[in-house]
Amino acid sequence: LAAGLAPDGGLYVPEHRPRLQHWSAHDSFAQTAAAVLAPYFHDDALVQVLPELCAQAFNFDAPLRPLATADDHVLELFHGPTAAFKDFGARFLAACLARLQQGRERRLTIVVATSGDTGAAGA
């Protein structure tokens, strides 16, 4: 979770994509996010607190908007506290790292960089 890049310098990509069933039957984006993320955390220490982490990270509205020409929807990614799409990923990553750090005496410093105006999402 904290490594960033894979050992070969690329991105981490799941070996398998689990089939997600009934993912849209939840009352909030945070609940849906926890259901979608759960298969990727199945053997991780955070799996038990995943719903709590999602509720903490996604404590804002994330509306789905229907597309005019198809039976599809678009998730609007500008409704977070900084109005940037990175509110979704950065806030979840920060919540996970903070939880992993709980109970440890050693201080953790997270250094991030941005090339645009979305850096506030990681703060």
Tell where the protein language model's regions lie, with residue ranges.
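PLP-dependent amino-acid enzyme catalytic core
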Residues: 1-123
